Amino acid sequence: MKLEDAKIKYIHTWGSLATSWGINKTMAQVHALLLVSTVALSADEIMETLKISRGNVNMNVRALIDWGIVRKEFVAGERKEFFVADKDIWELFKQVTKERKKREIEPVLKVLDELQKDVNENEEGVEEFKKLMSDLSSVTNTVNGILDRAIKADEHWLLSNFTKMIKK
């Protein structure tokens, strides 16, 4: 398979897989394209390669910048904006983990805490509900702690501990 064909296959596969993780297909394809590109790309180049609209490119590039996994890069002599993705996959993993934790885990913990405090004490089934919320909070806090360690860890520490955990 030629390199260009392999890149296209990767971009389309990554886009399809991403929907399983709750990530927009086009956003994943834009990120994959920037990841496999050896040079910074303009919105026009992204549009042309992926056959998507300028608005779609701009919306997804901005979202990727907000996630901290794509950045603008200055190209001398050009007025257009160019974009590049960080090629360090370990740093990518840590950044995505950090953002997902902030966007998904932390709001859940806040709601679980509120639900335990704000429920009317005088109703039947309150204790069972509070225990359920407490148990969910405990599990979510454990996951949150694991994610914190993963974000702070180096690649070898995490992979080593993950391998030990699987072997048990």
Descriptions of predicted regions:
Residues G68:
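Glycine-centered, phosphate/nucleic-acid-interacting loop/turn motifs that mediate DNA/RNA or nucleotide
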Residues I89-D135:
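Amphipathic alpha-helical dimerization/coiled-coil segments
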Residues K117-K168:
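C-terminal regulatory/oligomerization modules of transcriptional regulators
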Residues A18-T26, S42, V75-V96:
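Short, cationic-aromatic polyanion-contact patches
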Residues I8-S20:
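Short, Lys/Arg-enriched N-terminal segment that forms or immediately precedes the first helix
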Residues E45-E48, L64:
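A short acidic, leucine-rich amphipathic alpha-helix
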